[in-house]
């Protein structure tokens, strides 16, 4: 076959498969995956080296990391979540891509990649920014979720319209095979529209508003797309065999529950468990659910939850203004 024929054949293949070819190789893409961007301090316990950085400066930090680059880091607060998300991938279907976003340089970041290799985590893509904010790479990778220990980085990602959370220290580890993720509702899955009414007018005004708007779907919040991506993976399995289980854990109670249920129905998104707690502390309920991770917009709720499960603060909405 001549060169012209080979070019035509490649064009036919690209047309049939939706892939572009360059020199006979398919062009890599993340478009069909759930993309999780995670900082090195969320994935591993870097508390000792971070203390050196804050107390002694960047030069001492760089020396420490290089001197200890063969020492394996202990798992961090989001390690179990990442491990379980990567476990969703199958030989015939790669659902999840995890991206490392680190303020290390590539040189000092070698210890992180040595630890990734040690634990057998399938993470091959990374951005090392040498002290600069990592959040600018969240859109570039098409991330559905960004987890970091840096609140300002998280806020920037949220401002750009991406699901993001500041991880809290936690010793909780759920070693079951099933991935269990819990979400607060207002300002997380949903917008903070209803929360603003509560903050300005109190519980009675909030209840009146939600009863009157019960059949009006709530606008989406920053975690809607991430929840939808999880639901898309769930839809590949029979309900009783899904490797993912989700829960809505909200301070709402009746009658404010109806609008939430109808909103999820309009979105065609399945939530496996819904806990309407009417203001009760969420920690024990999250422990009972067995959450691998919980997302909430109110810091006090996250601090309480972190005593029982791994948790992240979503600094978004009226409660964080």
Predicted regions and their residues:
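Leucine-biased recognition of intrinsically disordered, low-complexity hydrophobic segments
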Residues: 8-9
């Amino acid at each position: 076959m001549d060169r012209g024929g080979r070019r035509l054949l490649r064009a036919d293949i690209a047309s049939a498969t939706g892939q572009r070819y360059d020199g006979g190789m398919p062009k890599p893409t993340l478009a069909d995956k759930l993309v999780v961007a995670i900082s090195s301090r969320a994935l591993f316990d870097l508390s000792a080296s971070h203390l050196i950085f804050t107390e002694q400066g960047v030069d001492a930090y760089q020396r420490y990391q290089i001197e200890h680059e063969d020492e394996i880091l202990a798992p961090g607060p989001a390690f179990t979540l990442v491990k379980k998300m990567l476990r969703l991938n199958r030989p015939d279907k790669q659902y999840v891509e995890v991206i490392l976003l680190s303020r290390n340089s590539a040189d000092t970041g070698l210890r992180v990649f040595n630890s990734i290799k040690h634990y057998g985590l399938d993470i091959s893509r990374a951005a090392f920014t040498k002290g600069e904010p990592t959040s600018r790479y969240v859109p570039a990778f098409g991330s559905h979720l960004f987890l970091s220990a840096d609140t300002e980085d998280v806020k920037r990602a949220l401002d750009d319209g991406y699901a993001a959370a500041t991880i809290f220290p936690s010793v909780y580890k759920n070693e079951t095979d099933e991935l269990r993720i819990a979400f607060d509702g207002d300002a997380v899955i949903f917008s903070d529209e209803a929360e603003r009414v509560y903050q300005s007018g109190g519980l009675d005004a909030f209840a009146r508003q939600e009863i009157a708007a019960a059949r009006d779907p709530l606008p989406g919040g920053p975690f809607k797309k991430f929840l939808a991506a999880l639901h898309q993976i769930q839809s590949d399995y029979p309900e009783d065999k899904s490797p993912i289980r989700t829960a809505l854990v909200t301070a709402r109670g009746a009658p404010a529950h109806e609008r939430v249920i109808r909103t999820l129905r309009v979105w065609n998104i399945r939530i496996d468990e819904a806990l309407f707690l009417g203001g009760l502390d969420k920690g024990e309920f999250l422990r009972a659910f067995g959450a691998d991770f919980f997302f909430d917009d109110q810091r006090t709720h996250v601090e309480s939850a972190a005593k029982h499960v791994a948790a992240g603060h979503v600094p978004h909405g009226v409660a964080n203004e």
